[in-house]
Amino acid sequence: LKEMDEILLNTPNQKSIIDICKNNNLDPSQVVKVIIYLGRLEDKSKLPILVSIRGDQSINEVKLFNLINKKYKSNLISLEVIDKESDAIKNLNQVPFGFLGPDLEDNKINLDSKWEKRWIRVVDFSAYELSKFISGSNNLNFHKFFNSWSSLTQQFIKADVRRAKEGDYLSLETNETLIEKRGIEIGHIFQLGQKYSEKLRARFSDKKGNLGNIWMGCYGIGVTRLAQAAIEQNHDENGIIWPIE
């Protein structure tokens, strides 16, 4: 990305990575997108989280959940994306969705809200490695050219929160890459935490009589799918070859 004379770019109605790249001759890898999350802790705290990631990558919410969970003594119950359609938008002051930058001011959080009053700023390594990049200016219809991350005064948590994808190297010590293939889901685990029990007020009392929200999980095995998958991988022209296992 070449140095730009104009720091602000006029990008009317260019709210998506596709739009800004198409209209400004940019590649998604040169753009940093910013997403707002809200984390709810077991102690009722509500954490506004600002995640910056390279435009050609997507966020792995399990990684993000685990990252935030490790930084607080109280357990993280849920993590949700906040956009202009969210009910939680009432806790923000005129946030320009589609034009968010990593330096979004803390004063965008409504002082009357029950949220923490400072952003937890997370930047994925894919974005932090960029020496120059384009991102939102925090003003409607404008994006901004950033010279470096070091020019920003805010504190950032640098972490791996991106979703792995085909073509990624397995490690720095090998040229082997990930291959993506379609499969059949024969079982699943959903770690629901306290997301639903909090809303349903599904509680338990401990030995001391203290109330707590139930920790929930969903564990399933698709019996019919399991048979289907076994047949798909174990057959010949004469029919099914059931595996011994």
List the predicted regions and their residue ranges.
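Extended, low-hydrophobicity, polar/charged segments
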Residues: 1-226, 233, 237-242
